[in-house]
Amino acid sequence: LGKEKIQYSYSSDTRDVAGVPNALYNCVCSFEHTVQLQAQTRLADFISDVDADIKRDLQPQSKRRRMTEQMGWVYKVNQQKAPLRIKQRVFQMGEYIGGTISDFWLSYLGNPLLPATQELQKYTKDFNVWVPPDGGSMGVEASSLNGIITLCIENKAEMPGLAGMIRTAFEKEDITVLEAVDLDT
């Protein structure tokens, strides 16, 4: 990767811990972590730590604490003496201004590795366009439908041949790749 460390981030639906599980509005908190890399680091070397971080962060107490931290930031922005259009722009910048800048994002609702569920199908339909935060070099959206995991990756650095490189990396980890395609947007 040409880096000594990478940051990864993910967001979680917090409607359950806020006591409004059926609310029709967006209620999320975002987490970020850093992984130190060595010259020959492989995904298998650190994925169990990533999994442990995610499981710990998705506990109700952690989600409430992070949601409170983020709401405090929103309140501070709202208290600024600035025109509404400036405040709206700050809100639109979201996690970038909030300090959650990452090399890649894990984005999902529930468990992306479960078989197709109505909730997951609705999520992928509602959020079929996903843009990584400004400052991120690439963004990753992962979903699972009928046992097939789909990764949509936006390569903001516009590095040619990324699909082929990703295929090679996955196959080195013994992961079958059905298709890897560079799409123009």
Where in the sequence are the language-model features?
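Acyl-thioester-dependent acyl-group transfer interface
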Residues: G2-T185
